């Protein structure tokens, strides 16, 4: 792990503009349906990701279930998903919109699971079928999806990821929930789909 003031990184990757982001409130968590875990969990884990990203899918299949059971469902970590579309248009953007539209009906995580379970083989023509399968109001979902609601918010997520210094997906930030990163308690960047053990090591250190 490498320390850079208010920020630490693992895997030897240096990230920039971190103190400025913390001072500007970057990484602030809002209750928009993309949060798993207790609001008062001591640690917050942010993921910046794309539903079409192969390494993001690897995290979903191999690491996410273990983090969910050991840390999130036990109240130790609050998990927040952020969109980081790899292009300005196309299936990645459409998948992010579909998930947000599901979230508007309180069903973000079932759509998240469905999209990542497709292992990158996504087709926007199937999204309305996914909406039906997870019990959404189909007309409301179709209107939201067809009007491309949430695009501005999706791109804001990507801008936030860039300010943390990420240039690819997935990227993760670990920080204390109360107070955010400080010089004494810096945030931790975990770039890429690193093994579960890397997450566990950093989380356990912060919880100690």
Where does each model-flagged region fall?
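A short beta-strand-turn-helix
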Residues: 26-43, 71
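Signal peptide processing junction and immediate N-terminal pro/mature segment
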Residues: 22-24
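Bacterial N-terminal signal peptides
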Residues: 9-20
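C-terminal cap of thioredoxin/glutaredoxin-like
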Residues: 62, 129-208
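Structural alpha/beta surface segment adjacent to cysteine/selenocysteine redox centers
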Residues: 41, 49-132, 137, 207
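Acidic/histidine-rich, surface-exposed loop or edge segments in extracytoplasmic proteins
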Residues: 46-51, 184
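Soluble periplasmic/extracytoplasmic beta-strand elements of cell-envelope proteins
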Residues: 44-47, 78-81, 171-173, 189
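Bacterial N-terminal signal peptides that target proteins for export
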Residues: 1-11
């Amino acid at each position: 792990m490498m320390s850079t003031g208010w920020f630490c990184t693992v895997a030897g990757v240096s990230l920039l503009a971190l103190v400025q982001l913390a001072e500007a409130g970057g990484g602030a968590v809002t209750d928009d349906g993309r949060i798993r875990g207790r609001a008062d969990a001591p640690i917050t884990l942010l993921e910046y990701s794309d539903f079409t990203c192969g390494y993001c899918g690897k995290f979903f299949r191999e690491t996410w279930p273990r983090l969910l059971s050991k840390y999130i469902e036990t109240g130790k970590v609050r998990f927040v998903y952020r969109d980081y579309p790899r292009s300005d248009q196309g299936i990645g953007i459409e998948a992010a919109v579909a998930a947000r539209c599901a979230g508007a009906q309180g069903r973000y995580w079932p759509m998240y699971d469905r999209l990542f379970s497709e292992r990158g083989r996504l087709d926007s023509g199937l999204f309305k079928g996914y909406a039906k399968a997870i019990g959404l109001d189909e007309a409301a979902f179709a209107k939201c999806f067809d009007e491309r609601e949430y695009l501005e918010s999706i791109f804001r997520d990507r801008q936030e990821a860039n300010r943390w210094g990420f240039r690819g997906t997935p990227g993760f930030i670990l920080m204390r929930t109360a107070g955010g990163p400080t010089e004494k308690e810096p945030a931790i960047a975990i770039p890429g789909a690193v093994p579960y053990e890397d997450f566990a090591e950093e989380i356990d250190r912060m919880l100690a």
